[in-house]
């Protein structure tokens, strides 16, 4: 499966590298086969970041879309680092942070937006990491 063909089938366009909010690397290679990837906000080419809390200002579905947008940004950053997303052999770990109201407990469902995108683009064997 060619990752770029799959992205096109899903209607996903890769973006320019994510603007950084501090002094750090978007992607940091470690050894020959591992990349550490910085997190990113859910901005896209059309509108700015979502700012607010799940459970009070945003629904679970809107949170899932934000998580999906974050993953598109991460995949875009990986493309710019690697030059070819087909080089990726496995995603090992997905760590997600969700800003939420005090009585919101559906964080796993929100992060499914990012996990589902990885699975849809890369398949189960490559795109289904452990998650926290």
Specify the residue positions occupied by each region the protein language model found:
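Short, polar/acidic, helix-capping and beta-turn segments at strand->helix junctions
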Residues: 1-132
């Amino acid at each position: 499966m060619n990752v770029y063909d799959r992205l096109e089938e899903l209607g996903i366009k890769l973006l320019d590298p994510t603007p950084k909010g501090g002094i750090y690397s978007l992607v940091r290679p470690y050894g020959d086969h591992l990349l550490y990837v910085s997190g990113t906000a859910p901005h896209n080419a059309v509108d700015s970041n979502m700012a607010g809390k799940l459970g009070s200002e945003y629904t679970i579905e809107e949170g899932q879309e934000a998580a999906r947008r974050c993953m598109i940004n991460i995949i875009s950053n990986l493309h710019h680092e690697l030059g070819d997303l087909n080089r990726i052999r496995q995603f090992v770990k997905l760590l997600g942070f969700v800003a939420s109201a005090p009585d919101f407990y559906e964080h796993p469902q929100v992060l499914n937006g990012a996990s589902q995108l990885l699975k849809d683009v890369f398949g189960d064997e490559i795109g289904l990491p452990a998650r926290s």
